[in-house]
Amino acid sequence: MADTPSAFAVFDERFHRLLGPSPSLELLLEHHDYPFAHEAGVYLPSTDEIFITSNQFFNSSGQRSIQISKISVGDGSRKATREEIPSDGVPMANGGINYKNGILFCAQGSETQASGLYYMSSSSPYPSSLLISSFYGRPFNSLNDVVIHSDGSIWFTDPIYGYEQGYRPKPELPNQVYRYDPVTKGIRAMADVFGRPNGIAFSPDEKTVYITDTDWIHGDGSMDGMRPSTM
């Protein structure tokens, strides 16, 4: 493990309570075969493990893929280790969050597999199940990130990056933010003013939801400073 200089930008003094007086960054693990650490970052305190999703890469069969990994964090007496998790059950996984006794992933989907919210067990053999994949019959584009309100509702973003990157069908929905109630199975579009809604999080009192709009860069790699890059 290697220490690097502190690189924390603090905009709220309360953050210092979490950082302590001398925060530092520590490299736990690195992997050079593919970009293994990209999204999710779901930490399970009970097992001291982190579930992450890779960035896209082409596997040995030449297919576009995303790999889910489980990181056992380790401590001073043992190094962090990585285990590749079977990822076929969550097609092109991206953002994730703690949910029940496992992880709720945003799956971007493929030409043949649905984009949607997938629940995956945190224990081997890591079975997964689909919660929702459409808005009143119209398939989601390529779900990106997710957060859960204390009332149990699930909020998530759905940009069209999958289509732009060539692995999802033509979109049938705008770039929108949704609220899903897993009890009633009700689904509502909450916002549709974004170019490419991406990250999502609630304020501590849950009265405000923060959403990043990464419209500045599109899925084909094109960048335009006239497009939003905002929160």
What is each stretch, according to the model?
Residues Y43-T47, N98-N101, I148-G152, P204-E206:
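Residue-level detector of Asp-centered blade-edge/turn motifs that repeat once per structural unit
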Residues S72-S77, M120-Y126, D181-K185:
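Short loop/turn segments that connect beta-strands within beta-propeller blades
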Residues Q56-F57, Q63-G109, S115, L131-F135:
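Blade-loop segments of beta-propeller domains
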Residues L28-Y34, E83-G89, L130-P139, R168-P169, ...:
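Surface loop/turn motifs at the tips and blade-to-blade linkers of beta-strand repeat domains
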Residues F36-A37, R64, V90-M92, Q113, ...:
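Beta-rich catalytic cores
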